[in-house]
Amino acid sequence: MALFRALYIIWVFLLIPLSNAEEFTPKVTRTLSRYVFDIVNFDDSNTLIRAEEDSVEISFDAGENWKTIDEIEEPIESFVVDPFRGHDRAFAFVKTAPKFYVTDDQGKSWRPLTIPISEKASNYFCDVTTHPIKKKHLIIRCDLLTIKNSGLMYVGREIYTTNDGVSFSQVKPSFGKIDGHISTARCDFIKSSEDSDLGGNDASILCLFRNTEYIESTGSTIDKSELILSADGGETFKELVQFKDKVVSRYEILKHHVIVLTQDDMYNEMSSTNIWISNDVSTFQVARTPTKIRHVNMGQIHEDSIGRIVLPVSRERDDEDSNQPGAAEVLISDSEGLKFLPINWIPNNQFGYINVAYPGFLKGTFFGSFHPFIEYSDRKRKYSRQKVREETKVSVDNGLTWTNLKVVDRENVDLFGCDVTKPERCSLQTHFYDLRNLNPSAGIMMISGIVGDGSAYNWKEEKTFISRDSGLTWRLVHNSTGLYTTGDLGNIIMYIPYRSNENGDVPSKFYYSLDQGKTWGEYDLIMPIYPYRLVSTISDGSGSKFILTGTSITEDPIFITYSIDFSAVFDYKSCEEGDFEDWNLADGKCVNGAKYKYRRRKQDAQCLVKKAFKDLSLDETPCNSCTGSDYECSFEFVRDAKGDCIPDYNLIALSDICDKSKGKSVLVKPLQLIKGDKCKTPMKIESVDIPCDEIPKEGSSDKEIVTTENKFDFEIKFYQYFDTVADESLVMLNSIGDAYISHDGGQTIKRFDTDGEKIVEIVFNPYFNSSAYLFGSKGNIFLTHDRGYSFMIAKLPEARQLGMPLDFSAKAQDTFIYYGGKNCESILSPECHAVAYLTKDGGETFTEMLDNAIHCEFAGTLFKYPSNDDMVMCQVKEKFSQTRSLVSSTDFFQDDRKTVFENIIGYLSTGGYIIVAVPHEDNELRAYVTNDGAEFTEAKFPYDEDIGKQDAFTILGSEEGSIFLHLATNLESGHDFGNLLKSNSNGTSFVTLEHAVNRNTFGYVDFEKVQGLEGIIITNIVSNSEKVGENKEDEQLKTKITFNDGSDWNFLKPPKKDSEGKKFPCDSVSLDKCSLHLHGYTERKDIRDTYSSGSALGMMFGVGNVGDRLLPYEECSTFLTTDGGETWTEVKKGPHQWEYGDHGGVLVLVPENAETDSISYSTDFGKTWKDYKFCGDKVLVKDIITVPRDSALRFLLFGEAKNMGSGSFRTYTIDFRNIFERQCEFDITGRKRADFKYSPLGSRTGCLFGHKTEFLRKTDEKCFIGNIPLSEFSRNVKNCPCTRQDFECDYNFYKASDGTCKLVKGLSSANGADICKKEPDLIEYYDSSGYRKIPLSTCKGGLKLDAHLAPHPCPGKEKAFREKYSINTGAYALVFVTILLVIFFVAWFVYDRGIRRNGGFSRFEEIRLGDDGLIENNRTDRVVNIIVRLGLCISLITKSAFQRAKAGTAQLSSKFRARFGNKKGATYSSLLHDQLSDEPDGFHEDSNDLSSFRGQGSNSEIEQEDVDTSQQEHTLRTDLLGASNIPDALPARSASHESDLAAARSEDK
């Protein structure tokens, strides 16, 4: 019984604390408002401020009573409480004026301050930055919102510094007025906190201004910036010289460091970033990162307890509407802040985003969570979850080791779906969002999360957990999620759920704990609330008062504020010494070389601490012996997979250890003590001998080139970049189906995790450059629309994969067609057939669109003017048949299906055309073309004696309104060739450009248009085609080039000397016997390896030789042109692979089919070359690539190291960025000095395609170009008069040896009436002149070879034609009769008043001039008599002249008969007969004599000021070069033209 009584007493005493806590009720005060959504509170006080509609109110009793602040008269935009003086000072900014109010006594009094902004605005958005020590120093920043005349909103940013409002000083950039283009205007005090190492006690200010100029014509931007520093509180500023020529994007001021980010490319806001670090604000150094950084989450940068910088890195998504978090990784610097490395536990083969939280009050403690990129949707979809795991970890030793979050909760073990005793498989998973604003405490914290293995994260299953040991172990406290906060250093915990139950009801109570989460009480609120904010009134979490804000659930919501006061708990008792215990940080282990412990209240103590967190002493005991955790790798070293520090070649090259060494090697310690570490006895570190033989010396450009090597066990078979300027992302696929993704040009590569599913094919969307599709072997398709940062997984239809490519809509990113096999248990089964499946939602759902379809096109999205925007065309191959048909539909074959052709060979689309190959009789083909999807027209090929049957043709592309086509004329395997044809604008009428153009058995043709330049094409012809066709000789290839889109061709002009300065063996003047020949398209391993680049204008590489024919590949050398093919230079002996970078500013060559350890590069457009050794052992380089736009400075090499076992396949990323001193300056207006100038290409300073064009080229090789779209800024100096080179031969005409277009014998010209069918509104057409203008030409006036002759009526329009050109007899008759009547009346009047009245005609010869015998009674009589006298005078003179002429003629006639009377000869009629007896089709032969066109006004539109003799002469010379030895042959009308032509002919000779 005594024992029972004792136990009872003990139980009573244990119950007392709980009963006391249950009996306590916090003081809760409610405040309602209709206009305020937030309430501002002063630290550790009952004073609250809120803004009503027209007034500002204050409460000094936690919201029980409110009164209006009379000093504040205007509407307030915002309140700001001074973060360093939160107990007393606050600012209230006025919305409608540049004005704010200040209180220094917790709102009891306010004083106004007016900002001296002169510009008027409708709204002002201002904020303030205060100094942590100097109270009177303020920085004011205002955004001005005004409405301009155009109605557009304009934001101007202005910054002022002030000494407590006594005076204001505006801060301005030096580059001009702050306007709407200013994207950044920011100033901050260097000293960011009271314990900051920077700035001392002064008021130094750092300011950044950044201006962004938008180039509307190209869609690009130009950025400029200015970073300035003031050491006198804002009175004077000076620019930081180190950043003078750089674009500073942002900066961040931390406790120990200032971080400045500079944009690598001022013309690309998405370009990579350099990170500059300083600890004294005077000297900045570039930090080393694993790869180039593009997007940094500046607001989340912080320092850990030893001063290391934690740098979150993200990327921007292309889809602005997506709510998916941005991709990210977290880098942590060394203790010097100069070398960054990623967190070591993050999966290196998975893409996702990372959250890292660092509670600053817990030294050495980090929380991290990794979340794979998977898009979620509430809609039902056929997405399977990508099996990549969530991971959540904690570290208590500064990130050296990490562990899972262990759940220790025996009472609730049944609530978890896994065994929590095995934390490696079952642990707490969370996102750690709430830890960023965690209130300080001695290891007490709460988070929301779920318990599992990380394979799934269901937000609906989230619960709330608590930890008392800084996150090492956790316990469940609530089965829901909500808002929580702590007070009194963790001894008071408040929690309110977002929903009170599973039905989603609004919470009507909150929960609280007074024993660090062990037990919980609850409080019923007067009014339910949608909670959105729960905070302690003291920022460091040491107070006992809280503010809860939210909205009501009424139809007309009102804002609710609850003020909650726990200060009376435990009868206001404060803790004494016996109420505390020691709590060891990190379980008592050494952190930063010391052991740390806090004194915290015991869990069941009945008291409050009532002290600020900073007043709690953190006991620090240095550790005696240093261990490996106290060290980090020296700058030149990195940790390997085992954790050992090993030398890094790139870091050694960046450091100066070898520059300082006098020998061939240098001794370096691989470990260095972490800066600020407290351990007493250092470890003994053995130095490592680093060879310096291959390390580039200081001043060498090779020192600045950075190479990164990656090793693979299997060969990379496929690789392709995403064609965007956002970054350098690419996808690679190896020989066993593993996919890899890189976002930095191959520098860092991650394997794409498919949970064991092999990738069998990768397809890129040709219309949306950020999209790609990876086909899995198990029926999944992995889709990305953001360059591989995130993927969705779609389940393909239940059909066999046939390996057929997807077909995409050109206008809808999520719409494409997939082809699968039905009834294909065996691919050889006769029932196996293809089915086209359509998706419009990016793969969420597929519908069966068309059975037996093997190729479809979204035709309505391809044409410029489609007959129907929704039109789809499909090629259908029926089961048990080899026949293929072409069908179309405008509703995806639901109800509409139309057969276009019953039998086709195939079809394709190019440049706004669809071309169908249709079988014809006698095993021939016919081509039909459409440019609207409705009307198909047969393509008319020219008659030619060397064209037999139309057996095969290749579409080579379509540009500028013409289709280029290769029509095979010889199909014998290994000896294929044919004619190169070009169409008219609608693709239906073709003319021959060149004969015997080489092709291979696969249909590929040696044809390449030079990218970026108009009308330049290179082909290889079979020079001995006749003998090859007769099987008498092997092919002999020669290379030809055209500069006017195929109208004229010539051989390539060879260089005079080779790369070694020696003359070539052949030096004939005739290009037919000695020219440059290049291997072409038919021999390429990768068809993407073109001669030219669209961004390196005028530059082309080629492998070939100088001679009379093309030699085998291995016997050739490498040649370069920089003027579009006019002149060439041999740059290297032997075949090389090439690549362009920086728009041609960097050229790179690597030997082909030979092992090497070096590349050759040029930064002066190929004038000089340097070698760079990129690896230690020689490798066979399979390919060299860069971004499709050739604008990057990074190149990626794929190599194979022979006989090296595992990892013999390598990639090398070579970065040239650092060899350039700066970025080239470009001024679009041309008003300022820039590093570019306009110049013509080569010596072709005359006209080409009817205009003179100049191109931009950089002038300084020390600068790099970047993302300037140079090709967009080429300019046409002027349009030119038309010449022969602006025309090509029309259909059924061919170019003769004299340069004229002649009609093919036996044929007639194109039927001009065909145009009447295409344009029904026409009433007339014209016959062909034999010439047609080249579509690219813009010439005006001059020669008019295509001039039309007499018009003909269109069939059926004869009446309209006659009406247009016939005379209107009725109208003309009326006019004629009217004129006759007028003449008759005048004549009668003159006769009656002037002749008859004065005696009639009998006196006619008696009247003399001046005779007064005529009757003149009035003015009318005088006028009539004057007319009579004038008529008499004229008649006498005419009569006299006639008589004299008659007499002279009679005399000449008699003399002529006397001299020639007996001679006979041809009469005029016989001469006329000879003219008219010419052959009937002689009209067409007029095309043979171009003089007939000269009379049509060849110079009719040339103005005197446009005539430049030197340019005209040069134009003629250029024409002759383009047309070999063909003279222009145009007889001129003027002496100047005759002299020009004479000069041309003499030069031709």
UniProtKB/Swiss-Prot annotation:
**What would you give as a GO molecular function for this chain, any one?**
nucleotide binding
Chain intervals for the UniProt region annotation (Disordered): 1479-1549
Instruction: List locations, semicolon-separated.
Output: Golgi apparatus, trans-Golgi network membrane; Endosome membrane
Record-linked InterPro entries: Sialidase_sf (IPR036278), Sortilin_C (IPR031777), Sortilin_N (IPR031778), VPS10 (IPR006581), VPS10-sortilin (IPR050310), WD40/YVTN_repeat-like_dom_sf (IPR015943)
Fill in the misc note.
Answer: Present with 319 molecules/cell in log phase SD medium.
**Which family does this protein fall into?**
Belongs to the VPS10-related sortilin family.
Q: Could you tell me what this protein is called?
A: VPS10 homolog 1
Q: Which organism is it from?
A: Saccharomyces cerevisiae (strain ATCC 204508 / S288c)
